[in-house]
């Protein structure tokens, strides 16, 4: 599809929350006043220096930002091409990028006088970050999690409960992230007066994709400054994994108007693109889910199909609407990595750098293993290491033991 190139790739969405034909707000009438309230509160907070100052204080002293930009010397040497830097989001409090967004949303919820917070979670990282901030600010916390994910992410379930959250296993549908999001939306419709829905990715009805992106953009803004400091210039390429796509959008957005920077998003190809996978752009088409129009995995009748990934955090049949738009206008290249490729990358990074990545960013590392060797030695490549692998060690251990039998 030929779409006219915009003057800026960073000016979206429009006032109705659209990025081209994507995005928007497709919600029940009951939720419309809440969504409009949220948008109003967010616009006011953005313009309020006190809100920004308070948030920056927590980002520094509670989350532990800025996160380091680390030169992966042995990985670079091993692959024999581009100079690889890791943006170390896994060193944040709670172990992933999720806390950047949750902090912003919980501060908004407090500003709006909401005392009960609900969230959906796949890998459990967004749930843990939400439970953590609710504990810090003394708010009630309910986390919806697909029953399948509850099984495969036990360490995070225990963490959430220790932090005082109520974890609700969702038994409907495929019992994964999509179903958890459905349940959270149902809860929100029922409890509109006192409840704030803290969405974990750049999806959902407007203004969520925008506010989550803005809270996550600290990743790309820091990377820009850090790269300038160590290399004196912009990176040549960026790589990040994509489920809904908030860690990727956080890294990408500040660089969208820098034409010299090549950008790669990596979806989960599961068992392969002709079999079960979670690659909405590679294997999907535009449709409406969870309040926005975006690329989705659908059958011929438009029914949402099951997504599959070894990684619970990428196991979603859609993608953030801004990613769909960036794909259609050609600013970002969307690739995919299979379960097996991610497993190999998980092991490689652990052994070469002493960093055990989450299975989600292991998908990004898998594509770096392909991209880096084809690039010159002075090519600067930044990978978003969006989460740590503690939560995945039991699962990966079982898989590897099974394979060695």
From Swiss-Prot:
Pfam families: PALP (PF00291). Pathway: Amino-acid biosynthesis; L-tryptophan biosynthesis; L-tryptophan from chorismate: step 5/5. Its cofactor is pyridoxal 5'-phosphate. Keywords: Amino-acid biosynthesis, Aromatic amino acid biosynthesis, Lyase, Pyridoxal phosphate, Tryptophan biosynthesis. Its EC number is 4.2.1.20. The keyword Amino-acid biosynthesis applies. Belongs to the TrpB family. HAMAP family: Trp_synth_beta. The beta subunit is responsible for the synthesis of L-tryptophan from indole and L-serine. This is Tryptophan synthase beta chain. It comes from Bradyrhizobium diazoefficiens (strain JCM 10833 / BCRC 13528 / IAM 13628 / NBRC 14792 / USDA 110).
